[in-house]
Amino acid sequence: SISPHEKACYHHIEFPSYKGVEVEVHYRPSFLLCFWHNRKLQKYYESVKEEQFSHRVMLGEQGEIAIPTVEFNLIFQLTHIYAHLMNEGIGLRQLLDYYFVLSMLSVNCEMLTSLQKELKELGLWKFAGAIMYIMQEVFGMPASRLIVPPNEKHGKFVLNEVLEAGNFGRHDARNRFGRSQLGHNLQRVYRDIRLVRYFPAEALCEPFFRIWHFFWRLKHRSQSL
C-alpha cells in the first residue's frame, strides 16, 4: 500500500485529493465487461506495450516524450468510449477525441485489414460501425477515413444516448432510481436492459462483472493491509 487511503479498482487507483487536485493512476489502459473479450483485450495490450513505451515524439522545445501510436489509440479510445456508454454515458468530447485520432491516421490496406480483424476478435465491430456513422453524419468525416462500414441502426441508437445522457449521464432524465448505492445499482440494470438489444455481450456480462469486481476489490484490499 502506497498510502492508507487509496482506493483500487480493476482499472485504476484513486488517491486522496491533494489541495483540491484529484489523483487517479491508471495501471490498465481500459477493459471490457465481457470476460472473454476482456481477456483478449488485455493480451492485446500486453503484446503492444513495448511499442507504445518506445514510441517517442518531440514536444516543441520541451524535449522528447512517449505517446501511444495512432493504431493503438484507435482501439484504446474506442474501448474508452464503449465503457462510457455501458456504465454512465458518453459526451461529445469523447467522440471529438476520436475524430482527431481518425484525422491523424494514414490508411493502408494492410493496417486496415489487421485493425478490422482485431476489432472483430474484441467484439467491437458493431460499436465501431456505430461510431463511424456518428463520425460521418455529425462530424462530416470523409468516408475514406472510416475504419469500418458505418452502422446506421447502432449509430442512431448511440447518438441518441449521447444526446439524452451526456458525459457520465449527468443530464439523463431517465435516471429514476436516485443517487443511493441501491439506486445506482438499479440504474445500471435498467441501462443494461436498454443496451442489450444492440450490444448483448457487454450488457449481459455487466451484472456478473460487477459482482466479480466486488470480490476482486475485497481480495486486493485485504492484500494491501
List each language-model region with its residue ranges.
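Conserved NTP-donor binding/palm subdomain of two-metal-ion nucleotidyltransferases/polymerases, i.e.
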Residues: 2-225
